[in-house]
Amino acid sequence: MITIIGPTASGKTTLAAHLAASFIVEGQPAEIISGDSRQVYRGMDIGTGKDLCDYEVTLPANTQHPTPTTLKIPYHLIDICDPGEKYNIFEFQQDFLKAYEDITSRGALPILCGGSGLYVESVIREYHLSPVPKNEELREELSHKSMAELTEILMDLKEKNNSDMHNKTDVDSPQRAIRAIEIEAYNLEHKTEDRYFPPIETTIIGVDIPRDERRRKISTRLKNRVDEGMVDEIKRILDSGVSAEDLIYYGLEYKYVTEYVIGKRSYEDMLKELEIAIHQFAKRQMTWFRGMERRGCKINWIDAMLPMEEKVRAIRETISPPSPSPREGSSPLTPSRGSS
């Protein structure tokens, strides 16, 4: 398996699709497994950046095909549940395994691609997880706590569990914090020895985009998403019966735009605070990936600014290194850490 990770707006999905296409044209089928925690939801398209056109790769004309042709790269774990549901890491692991086994059983190459570091790492490092049932008694007890109190309880449980299983988004809202506490409390009382996840060999490629370029692309993309109808998309989801609380639970675009729609924020404040939050999120993603390296994951970083053809070639050479030959310069792929 090949794994492609990177912060938001780094172009990792487009890279994964072009990489898959490079195998397909050689007769080796390849399919993408999404490692995004929000693109699993149907109808949450603009806010999650679910650009399905990224999975279409146009190939130039050649002797066999006199006109350009478009390859549609098969993808998995996108649009698999409804807004309002609470998809979690355990479900992701199970769905990932089903997709992985389906792809490999047909002789195709799986490419895991995503920016949700926790989800991706749960596969790479074989997290031993089990479903955590709802604890209504605990939820009732916690429902009267302030965010500061919930955060303190969560940090205490994490320390007892020696856990880095959840990131800072756990305390974005009381609902998220309570669920995180519920999970940590359950794991504290239940042993993990019998929770098996099969080892999967993978080469990890990290897309390293310069900080200033990342910020520019995030700002541009946010403006484009607003122009494409992100606010209307969220209004439609609310009108379909999904509660504001449930949408806020999904964070970032769905949190800030929902708060605008229900009158908790002005339009200008929503845009300003959302842009700041996305920049902070991208920085946390890079922090997580650096943590993966410290936890033993070898990440081969590639410069996002390289031409697509060169990036694909460098990845292919990393997977199957060519015979040594004199060449100028160094490889575009390096095992050093990416930009923060």
Residue ranges and their predicted role:
Residues 36, 324-329, 337-339:
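Glycine-biased, low-complexity coil/linker segments
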